[in-house]
Amino acid sequence: FNPCPYSDDTVKMIILTRENKKHDF
């Protein structure tokens, strides 16, 4: 059972988005 609803690719995209937001601020 995988508690994470996201696939690995989606998780990577989310992490990249968070990193980009950090750099924006």
UniProtKB/Swiss-Prot annotation:
Enzyme class, broadest EC rank:
hydrolase
Q: Name one GO cellular component term.
A: extracellular region
How might one describe the regulation of this protein's activity? Activity is maximal in the presence of calcium. However, unlike phospholipases A2 whose catalytic activity is strictly calcium-dependent, this enzyme shows considerable catalytic activity on phosphatidylcholine emulsified in calcium free solution; the catalytic activity of VT-2a assayed in the absence of calcium ions is 18-20% of that assayed in solution containing calcium ions.
Pathways involved: Phospholipid metabolism
Enzyme Commission designation: 3.1.1.32, 3.1.1.5
Q: Does the keyword Nucleus apply?
A: no
| Location within or outside the cell | Secreted
What is the reported tissue distribution?
A: Expressed by the venom gland.
PTM annotation, UniProt: Contains six disulfide bonds.
Q: Name one GO molecular function term.
A: phospholipase A1 activity
Please indicate if the UniProt record lists Secreted as a keyword: yes
Where does the protein principally reside? secreted
Which reaction is the catalytic activity of this chain? a 1,2-diacyl-sn-glycero-3-phosphocholine + H2O = a 2-acyl-sn-glycero-3-phosphocholine + a fatty acid + H(+); 1-(9Z-octadecenoyl)-2-hexadecanoyl-sn-glycero-3-phosphocholine + H2O = 2-hexadecanoyl-sn-glycero-3-phosphocholine + (9Z)-octadecenoate + H(+); a 1-acyl-sn-glycero-3-phosphocholine + H2O = sn-glycerol 3-phosphocholine + a fatty acid + H(+)
One example of a Gene Ontology biological process annotation: lipid catabolic process
Keywords annotated in UniProt: Allergen, Cytolysis, Disulfide bond, Hemolysis, Hydrolase, Lipid degradation, Lipid metabolism, Secreted
Other known facts: Is about 0.95% of the total proteins in the venom.
Membership in a protein family: Belongs to the AB hydrolase superfamily. Lipase family.
What protein name is recorded for this chain?
Answer: Phospholipase A1 verutoxin-2a
Q: Provide the species name.
A: Vespa velutina
